[in-house]
């Protein structure tokens, strides 16, 4: 295949029903007598003369229309004819195994409601466009040219056609045209022989339209360089409209037919610019290296040249299948792609490329279900020795499944921006078994990488699958990755993925020798789950000159478990990236980690957690050996937690950690840590109601440094349980901000004042001051100096003033009550009245009253002639 800027769409194979061959007859071209058409026969060659003319339109009508192998059917029209309209009325399929041709630049229309088969030897020799259809009639503004209504004379009009009319169950169109050309090109590796599958071909800038019934393309080609190829059809009665731009409008509410491409079937509009492929069907199936190609051909194009788009509208499904299981990027399988500078495979199997100049077009897929399997591919790329932008890839569906397949937008070594990849699915998107969603700029390219945007109900990234937006060399920024799900986002390595380096990844990164910034990763969903060594990373690698990105998670429940990691690391002198999580609940367990740090001389990144509910940090052991290298793990392989630590060789300071939560719970090596080697430790700021740690399980809050100063730890909490400020110890839960050679940091723990009056009071030495709370009611003994006293021991049940009334829960006193009035006792401090009632206010305060209250029997002590101090236990 040639190296081009192109769009490739792989199509699945189909099994052709034998019914399509019914009613086919021996190759022949015969008029039906309804027009003035004549046919001259010379062996296998048929020359078509006369016909009915109206202005620039010429009309022919045939009873049979089939062309034998190595034969031809040539329309010998005047050069000033614009359109040739041909209908087949005899009730048999047209088998075209030879050449169809016409004079001048006339467009050729061929309709046969029974079906059309283009055999291996079928070719076109036209100066204009070709329209093949199994419609009943061609519509005009003033009538129709019908192949089924022969009772009325055919319409002969000077107007341009406006569309096609179909009856129920129109015939199918099959293309097996396998005409090929061998072209030689020369590039930096020498001369290469390229075999192009041409098939049915028109001149550059002209169009090919095939409208059925079902359309079957197998082991064949359709080529319209820089033109438009329309493929589609209806399976029920309806009308299709011709648009001025060469595209078609299909009716709503009418069932469409199917399109299949298999056995290297190729649909190609690549040229020096332009070229669109439009597919309008019910189901599109692609397999065995079927391809839709649009773009800039090798050694063609010019600055600013724009390749066309591939647009697929499938009301039910699009299925793209490769040949082999697994992924082998150098080979070409079934795919939808948009290339500038197509990589070529030499006869020895090695890969090379040739140049092109211009921008790749876009890929637009609209369907209910998109499935891409086993090396099926969507790709928009600019390859070496080419120059320009890659195009956008946009999929709108209800359900998307990508299994062992890539969706790619790439620029390799040249100048240009990478196109964005956007996947929208109302129900679900599943990327599984080593599939890749990639927006990447590689080599010395000057330009930005593309963005990856995913909007869906539920999203899963499973097995060895990856989403990557990165910049590898050159100048420019890496792209952003945005995932929004109305239900859930799930990432996990599968149990069958036993290889140590295989794990699901979402990566926005800046790699070596790149000048630019890494992208942002934003994931939003009610439930976000990372498990079994899943990785989300926004980083800047060694030798890159630029800032790492950040990771933001927005959800209700976020769980990071079984060795999964979110990191915003950098190996540059720039500050590390940030991690932000906004949720109601956050769990880090079984080796799950948040890591923001710096391996060079910059400062570590910051981590900010805004959690309205609980944060749980527990169990430092991941479920097996981690596939992550020491760059990510540092010395944290057997820990769970939140880390803004710098590497040992780093001279920067640790990052800051800010946490807001209702409760933070530590279990078994759950940690919060910011540390540095030569720089200062970072700050940890925690605002929570409670911090609870299971005792003696080495769960720590640390802001340390080796050579620099320790960081600061500020904690605002109602209470801390099981963890306290002290030196680090593997058997305890510690809060520590120390430095080995520098100054220790500062730890500030703020808990609320326990005084419920919210004011400072100097408390007396005794709990109850008897001289103020015990009334001297022993009147007979006052003159003798004998005073009353009350010592209360025990808990509850006894009021602190002896004249207070008891409730039902107090102790019982077995003595009669007196009805004698008790007069107030006069003291230097004023009159003292025995309490006779108790009132509880609405805000919970208890007030003792000098008068009896309802439903309470005030307890008035019996006056004794001799009182003494008594003790109540």
List the predicted regions and their residue ranges.
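Extracellular and secretory-pathway beta-repeat/beta-biased strand scaffolds
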Residues: 2-873
């Amino acid at each position: 295949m040639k190296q081009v800027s192109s769009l490739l769409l792989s199509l699945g194979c189909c099994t052709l029903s034998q019914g399509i061959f019914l009613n086919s007859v021996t190759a022949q071209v015969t008029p039906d007598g309804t027009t003035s058409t004549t046919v001259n026969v010379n062996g296998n060659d048929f020359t078509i003369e006369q016909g009915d003319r109206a202005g620039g339109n010429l009309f022919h009508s045939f009873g049979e229309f089939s062309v034998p192998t190595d034969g031809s059917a040539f329309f010998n029209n005047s050069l000033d004819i614009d359109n040739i309209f041909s209908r087949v009325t005899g009730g048999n399929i047209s088998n075209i195994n030879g050449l169809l041709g016409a004079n001048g630049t006339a467009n050729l229309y061929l309709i046969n409601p029974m079906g059309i088969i283009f055999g291996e030897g079928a070719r076109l020799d036209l100066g204009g466009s070709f329209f093949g259809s199994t419609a009943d009639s061609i519509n005009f503004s003033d009538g129709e040219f019908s192949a089924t209504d022969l009772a009325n004379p055919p319409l002969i009009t000077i107007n341009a056609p406006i569309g096609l009319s179909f009856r129920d169950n129109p015939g199918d169109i099959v293309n097996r045209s396998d005409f090929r050309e061998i072209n030689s090109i020369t590039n930096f590796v020498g001369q290469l022989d390229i075999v192009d599958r041409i098939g049915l071909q028109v001149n550059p800038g002209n169009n090919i339209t095939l409208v059925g019934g079902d359309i079957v393309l197998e082991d064949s080609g359709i080529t319209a360089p820089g033109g438009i190829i329309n493929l589609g059809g209806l399976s029920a009665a309806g009308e299709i409209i011709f648009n001025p731009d060469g595209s078609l409008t299909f009716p709503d509410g009418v069932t469409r037919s199917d399109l299949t491409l298999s056995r290297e079937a190729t649909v190609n509009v690549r040229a020096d610019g332009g070229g669109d492929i439009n597919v309008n069907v019910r189901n599109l199936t692609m397999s065995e290296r079927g391809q839709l190609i649009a773009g800039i051909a090798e050694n063609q194009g010019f600055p600013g040249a724009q390749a066309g788009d591939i647009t697929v509208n499938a009301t039910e499904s699009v299925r793209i299948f490769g040949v082999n299981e697994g992924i082998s990027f150098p080979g070409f399988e079934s795919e939808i792609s948009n290339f500038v500078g197509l990589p070529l495979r030499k006869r020895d199997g090695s890969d090379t490329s040739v140049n092109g100049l211009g921008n790749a077009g876009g890929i637009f897929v609209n369907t209910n279900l998109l499935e891409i399997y086993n090396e099926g591919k969507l790709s928009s790329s600019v390859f070496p020795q080419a120059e320009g932008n890659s195009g956008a890839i946009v999929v709108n569906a209800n359900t998307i499944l990508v299994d062992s397949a890539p969706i790619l937008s790439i620029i390799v070594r040249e100048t240009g921006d990478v196109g964005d990849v956007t996947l929208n699915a109302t129900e679900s998107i599943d990327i599984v078994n080593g599939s890749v969603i990639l927006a990447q700029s590689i080599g010395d390219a000057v330009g930005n990488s593309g963005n990856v945007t995913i909007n869906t109900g539920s999203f899963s990234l499973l097995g060895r699958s990856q989403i990557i937006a990165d910049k590898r060399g050159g100048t420019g920024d890496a792209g952003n990755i945005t995932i929004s799900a109305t239900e859930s986002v799930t990432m996990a390595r599968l149990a069958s993925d036993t290889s140590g380096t295989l794990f699901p990844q979402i990566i926005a990164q800046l790699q070596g020798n790149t000048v630019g910034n890494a992208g942002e990763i934003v994931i939003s969903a009610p439930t976000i789950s990372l498990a079994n060594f899943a990785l989300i990373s926004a980083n800047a690698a060694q030798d890159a000159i630029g800032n790492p990105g950040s990771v933001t998670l927005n959800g209700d429940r976020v769980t990071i478990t079984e060795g999964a990691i979110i990191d915003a690391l950098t190996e540059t002198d720039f500050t590390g990236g940030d991690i932000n999580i906004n949720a109601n609940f956050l769990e880090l367990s079984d080796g799950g980690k948040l890591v923001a740090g710096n391996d060079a001389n910059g400062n570590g990144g910051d981590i900010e957690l805004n959690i309205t509910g609980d944060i749980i940090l527990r169990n430092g052991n991941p479920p097996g050996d981690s596939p992550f290298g020491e760059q990510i793990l540092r010395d944290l392989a057997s820990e769970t937690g939140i880390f803004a630590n710098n590497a040992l060789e780093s001279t920067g300071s640790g990052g800051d950690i800010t946490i807001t939560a209702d409760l933070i719970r530590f279990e078994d090596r759950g940690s919060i840590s910011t540390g540095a080697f030569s720089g200062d430790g970072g700050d940890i700021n925690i605002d929570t109601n409670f911090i609870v740690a299971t005792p003696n399980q080495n769960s720590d809050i640390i802001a340390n440094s080796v050579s620099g100063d320790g960081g600061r730890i500020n904690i605002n909490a109602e209470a801390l349980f099981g963890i306290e400020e002290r030196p680090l110890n593997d058997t305890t839960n510690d809060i520590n901000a120390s430095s080995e050679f520098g100054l220790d940091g500062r730890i500030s723990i703020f808990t609320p004042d326990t005084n419920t009056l919210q004011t400072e009071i100097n408390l007396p030495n005794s709990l109850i001051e008897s001289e103020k709370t015990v009334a001297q009611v022993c009147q007979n003994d006052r003159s003798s100096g004998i005073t009353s006293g009350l010592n209360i021991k025990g808990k509850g049940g006894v009021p602190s003033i002896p004249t207070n009334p008891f409730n039902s829960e107090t102790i019982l006193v077995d003595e009669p009550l007196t009805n004698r009035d008790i007069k107030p006792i006069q003291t230097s401090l004023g009159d003292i009245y025995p309490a006779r009632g108790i009132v509880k206010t609405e805000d919970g305060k208890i007030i003792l009253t000098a008068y009896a209250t309802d439903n309470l029997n005030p307890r008035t002590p019996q006056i004794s002639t001799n009182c003494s101090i008594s003790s109540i236990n």
